[in-house]
């Protein structure tokens, strides 16, 4: 995982003049929107003193015993004016394996899950993304990114990021990703910007782009492991008992999928409802609503990425902390987890590691 940074107003909208995702690099002589992002970590102590009811501290036996921490961020040497109430939020990048299968989930099935949750008693009330007009003229439901701001992979986090993160141009993204205010500031600094205005030379051919998308959609999900072990089976029972499956919906059936027809009508188990949930004020970034992240493959993070940092801003250093950061709609599950025995907490985590 890496970070994306957002310079925004209190309501989550971008500060005027800044791109949706902050860019801190520029090819000389151009000057970036900011020289960098400063991240500071803060201690968090809950109302129980970071201890379970049995007296065991959170993260018992680890170097982080008894602690929970969360990050805040600010920009270093911003180029453009900032309002007094500006904020900087950081969000972790989202793994792109398995996203082709998620793309194949029907919009109507996600809406059906939303309606099911709204009809139920209890705190879990996920909300879907907005309907988005796609470049091909269709209207699709937003389901990708932490705030469901992208509807399809074709116009989604991986494909679009080639342009609005790295500024690689192609036929359907011919212009530099920048704001008029940034361009005007470059002129004020005496920098020749004539080469930036208007369509640019295509750096990525459409054939190369399509090849990339085949790879992107085809990234496989690692198989679940050890599901027949008694502790893992017991952990799965606890996962359901604690209500975790209320948001981390285990199973979907894909619909028709023209980009990769072989993905159609498959039963998949990503453990996400593809909806956004209120995770409490302590988890506020651009908002306090976050899409439920898929859990498949998370148990292999340490082997594949050499870390186990999770959550929208990577504040959770492992599965235990990820559960303990569940507030808002999910706080009742957090409380049930806290009241498990040491053995049961370990069994639940063993199940998560098996996915």
Regions inferred by a protein language model and the residue ranges of each:
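Periplasmic c-type cytochrome electron-transfer domains
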Residues: 1-355
């Amino acid at each position: 995982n890496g970070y994306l940074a957002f310079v925004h107003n209190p309501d989550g909208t971008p500060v005027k003049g800044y791109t949706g995702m902050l860019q801190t690099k520029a090819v000389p002589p151009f000057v970036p929107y900011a020289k960098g992002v400063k991240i500071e970590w803060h201690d968090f102590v809950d109302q129980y003193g970071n201890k379970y009811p049995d007296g065991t501290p959170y993260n018992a036996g680890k170097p982080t015993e008894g602690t929970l921490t969360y990050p805040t961020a600010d920009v270093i040497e911003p180029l453009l004016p900032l309002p007094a109430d500006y904020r900087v939020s950081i969000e972790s990048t989202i793994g792109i394996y398995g996203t082709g299968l998620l793309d194949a989930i029907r919009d109507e099935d996600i809406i059906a899950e939303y309606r099911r949750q709204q009809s139920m008693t209890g705190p879990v009330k996920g909300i879907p993304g907005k309907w988005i007009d796609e470049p091909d003229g269709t209207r699709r439901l937003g389901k990708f990114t932490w705030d469901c701001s992208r509807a399809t992979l074709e116009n989604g986090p991986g494909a679009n990021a080639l342009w609005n993160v790295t500024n690689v141009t192609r036929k359907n993204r011919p212009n530099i990703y920048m704001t008029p205010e940034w361009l005007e500031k470059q002129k004020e600094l005496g920098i020749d910007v004539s080469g930036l205005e208007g369509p640019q030379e295509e750096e990525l051919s459409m054939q190369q782009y399509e090849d990339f998308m085949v790879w992107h959609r085809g990234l496989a999900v690692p198989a679940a492991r050890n599901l027949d072990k008694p502790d893992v089976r017991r952990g799965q029972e606890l996962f359901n008992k604690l209500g975790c499956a209320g948001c981390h919906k285990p199973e979907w059936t894909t619909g028709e999928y023209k980009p990769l027809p072989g993905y159609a009508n498959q039963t998949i188990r990503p453990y996400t409802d593809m909806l956004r949930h209120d995770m409490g004020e302590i988890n506020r970034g651009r908002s306090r609503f976050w899409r439920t992240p898929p859990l498949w493959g998370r148990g292999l993070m340490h082997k594949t990425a050499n870390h186990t940092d999770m959550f929208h801003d990577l504040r959770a250093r492992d599965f235990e902390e990820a559960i303990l950061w569940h507030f808002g709609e999910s706080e009742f599950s957090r409380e049930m987890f806290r009241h498990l025995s040491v053995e049961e907490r370990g069994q639940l985590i063993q199940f998560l590691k098996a996915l």
